[in-house]
Amino acid sequence: AILNIKVRILSRKEVAPNIYLMRLKAPEITQDALPGQFIHIKCSKDNYPLLRRPLSIHRIDKEKGEIFILFQVVGEGTKLLAQKVIGDDLDIMGPIGNGFNIYPESRKIMIVGGGIGVAPLLALCEESIRQGKEVRVLIGALKKELVIGEESFKILGAKVDVATDDGSYKYEGLVTDLFERTIKEGWLADQIFACGPKSMLKKISEIALQANINYQVSMEERMACGVGACLGCVCKIKTKDKKEYK
């Protein structure tokens, strides 16, 4: 069930320029939340901005009843959210959306995150490792100071590689180039999970299809209702017979 509740901010930190990590006390959400789902946040006490902001659940701590969100300041809503302080309450709805589907038979998992696209992938990595999978994570960023989550993934036990567009840190080039190289080197995952810019996801899907590897993507869309009813956030998808919106 989708809940509409108030949650308290336990911590907030600017982890990279204009990118914030928040820890929220939300035991009601942690009970049912799955990696890949999101919450819908009201960013101010009045009705401006009118629409809630959809933010991925970055990490789920069921024992403590806490969730983490990782977000980038891109407009009025996220700017207001970044100004919140420890102890403030947030009006949220969630958990919403389809979570990632980790197949029981999958032994090797590849996770690819571009920019703020790493947001939903830490919870996925943690759950995959909990299930005994071997996990490899590829992170892409424009430059070194915008690389997010490298240490967090490593602490969980994943092997992590990083690509920066300008070559200021580790592999020089796009994360899709690093992804292609990793597959060509023979590291064949049973499943690939990705989140990031649409151009990145398109390239990932092309390479995964060519290599005949199952892949799932998490897409970022502007939202109104958050549940697909108003058709504001639906994406055009291809099924075996036709194209439809989901």
Spans of model-derived segments:
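Local cysteine-cluster metal-coordination motifs and their immediate loop/turn environment
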Residues: K198-S199, E221-K246
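FNR/FR-type flavoprotein reductase catalytic core
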Residues: E76-R222
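Short glycine/proline-enriched turns and hinge-like loops at secondary-structure junctions
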Residues: I19, A33-P35, L50-L51, I102-E105, ...
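Ferredoxin-reductase
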Residues: I2-I86
